Amino acid sequence: MATSVDNRHYPTMNGVAHAFKPPLVPSPRSFDRHRHQNQTLDVILTETKIVKETEVITTVVDSYDDSSSDDEDESHNRNVPYYKELVKKSNSDLEPSILDPRDESTADSWIQRNSSMLRLTGKHPFNAEAPLPRLMHHGFITPVPLHYVRNHGAVPKANWSDWSIEITGLVKRPAKFTMEELISEFPSREFPVTLVCAGNRRKEQNMVKQTIGFNWGSAGVSTSLWKGIPLSEILRRCGIYSRRGGALNVCFEGAEDLPGGGGSKYGTSIKKEMAMDPARDIILAYMQNGELLTPDHGFPVRVIVPGFIGGRMVKWLKRIIVTPQESDSYYHYKDNRVLPSLVDAELANSEAWWYKPEYIINELNINSVITTPGHAEILPINAFTTQKPYTLKGYAYSGGGKKVTRVEVTLDGGDTWSVCELDHQEKPNKYGKFWCWCFWSLDVEVLDLLSAKDVAVRAWDESFNTQPDKLIWNLMGMMNNCWFRIRTNVCKPHRGEIGIVFEHPTRPGNQSGGWMAKERQLEISSESNNTLKKSVSSPFMNTASKMYSISEVRKHNTADSAWIIVHGHIYDCTRFLKDHPGGTDSILINAGTDCTEEFEAIHSDKAKKLLEDYRIGELITTGYDSSPNVSVHGASNFGPLLAPIKELTPQKNIALVNPREKIPVRLIEKTSISHDVRKFRFALPSEDQQLGLPVGKHVFVCANINDKLCLRAYTPTSAIDAVGHIDLVVKVYFKDVHPRFPNGGLMSQHLDSLPIGSMIDIKGPLGHIEYKGKGNFLVSGKPKFAKKLAMLAGGTGITPIYQIIQSILSDPEDETEMYVVYANRTEDDILVREELEGWASKHKERLKIWYVVEIAKEGWSYSTGFITEAVLREHIPEGLEGESLALACGPPPMIQFALQPNLEKMGYNVKEDLLIF
């Protein structure tokens, strides 16, 4: 890759040397996140003592207040007071940003962010969009914390007082301006601009064939009121050369250090004619929605190029270089291109497609999206709803300053179209340019929606550009602007009435759902498809291995045939189910899916080597064809239309509906039971939800720790029928306590560090043991029964035992007898002791408890040492077939050396009668 612009040297022109001088290193005193993220400019100037004299302060504030007559006229023409009112309205119901626990242990841990933002690239770097309903709720102006973010790496820690921008290259008067000089010496402009990531709606492309980009949904778009200095004024001050003098491009370079091309800054460029065109309103912005920029959006200064993709708007701007050539930044060439559909990554690199100028993206294309109805929204069909129309809503935008002139909606696949009502809240600039999105709406009859199989939207701009019907795939997944379609299906909600449920094409990030995901599941298998493509995870097809499509793998998701994908390889784990230490559910929960991340999170190197014995082939993908119509709708009459309605039977609202989906939960209470034991209470997504965890099963707690997914199994201690929350009792294994484990417990320490309000994910249920009540168990699907239970636990292994005790005692008709032997290192290590002894005291005939500790205090009245045959014979029943079962959860040495041999001596068949969690 070419060297970065840092290393460029320019010839002397008119006696001025233009070799690059490195910019000053910003002060290590970083911009204080707590005090300065949202302060107004005059406060910052005062506190950082940028200016010393009253006269200078007055000049700065006057410039900030737009006191010049030209600026006043411009502000009046742009309707700035109206936009400022919209900013206030938009921010009125916005919760404060927080230091998100997900940013701990990253370089961005100092940045406050809105916790509702959907992260698209994991923990770091921060790339995020707002939930679509949330974005639309705030209206024309997007609150800054909900504005989409595209970061390539860590956010630079900037200081207003020592930040400067260097203007160099083909200019007569190279200069370096501080922030104070920029705002005091140049006029400013303030107007709204809609920013759009070129990857907006990319996940739809990834559903067809994986691109090299991550999964943007349809909220990679936001609108703010931006204030800054016109770029043309700065270049004019510095004496930019003419085209004849070689000044053809204006390059921008940011401050962040990135890995691309072996190490570089983020940089890009635009043509000189664009940079100098006053009609284009290009500014160096230092304010957003009336406040200084926040770190994620480029504090202290960034480029705003209205009507262009976000990739041209360099944040944390440090240098402007006027050159004959385009920017030679790695990111200028290896990003923001729309290559022909035939070009894959290998071809793009080998044939230098990245460097062909005709494929660079600058101006946005025309686009529109349906935002109402939302995904999974249900419209009831009844006497009330059918008496009034339903209002479809959405947004539309175009690029280059072109006005969106028409939005149309079709309910019949494009045979007929209805023209929507447009809401343009923006006044054009004096050159007639429009830089913002507009909103559209259309009233439709509910019965027309009932007979439609889908709803699609397309927009037109003043140049009569419109959106294509079908998706056009490209390697980077950019500029996707095909008709936005939502599918409709008839359902029957639990109240018994008919309803229409709406499905958007995708959901952002790694969230499951959307009709395109369903279509992908219905792809024909690789054996009958002639159009085989290379897998993203296996760039070169291995002809020695059998190749399987994702749709073929998805069929193998049962105990009879359990396949998984790890790093693009296919493994048949069916014969390993019965031997898996974590039980069959741990495999079945991921059967038929790509579980690379989960597998890496919980398996050792030994397990990874063992997996190779089960490898059967490699993953491919198939060419995309539209699947058969799976809608229940027909358009002719309502007789066949309603025939296949799916009955949604009344059921409890439970969180763990799909064991493969992660459920976000929020920490609402943390109690210290002892120096190293905590009780955590997490709120479920809905206040009226039950967890839905069968007795005997457990959940995975999922967290990103040190940039890696970490999964740990926990059994909740909350009641099975608890509503709105889940309780976990966790022993915290601190680092530098146990010599064998100097780093301590990764997950337990992470949970202990979480502040109230933090979010984690859980998934489940999993586990091979389920207690069905009245002595009945299902073990890997096979029934077992006992009147008496020997319940043997070590350390934190008490939690699944606790769960079963709780369930049995909550049922007055369950007469199962329970005999608990609970081993720990010391008396202080005994978990949930108060609850256990309270139950034992209240239910003396049904529950008996005995403790064993390795180290005892004086006066200890239970056993000391380890679990022995004598302890077991005295405190649990003999092993009698059909009468007794042993349940065990604890360290492997306890089970292998203390329990199994001694239980055998007591008549237990350890293969059949010992149930190990």
Swiss-Prot record:
Transmembrane segments: none
Entry keyword annotation includes Cell inner membrane: no
Positions that bind FAD: 712-715, 729-734, 741, 746-748, 799
Residues noted as binding heme in the record, renumbered to the chain: 580, 603
Pfam family, one: Oxidored_molyb
InterPro entries, sorted: Cbr1-like_FAD-bd_dom, Cyt_B5-like_heme/steroid-bd, Cyt_B5-like_heme/steroid_sf, Cyt_B5_heme-BS, FAD-bd_FR_type, Flavoprot_Pyr_Nucl_cyt_Rdtase, FNR_nucleotide-bd, Ig_E-set
Functional note: Nitrate reductase is a key enzyme involved in the first step of nitrate assimilation in plants, fungi and bacteria.
PANTHER family in the cross-refs: SULFITE OXIDASE, MITOCHONDRIAL, SULFITE REDUCTASE
Name of the protein described by the UniProt record: Nitrate reductase [NADH] 1
Species this protein is from: Arabidopsis thaliana (Mouse-ear cress)
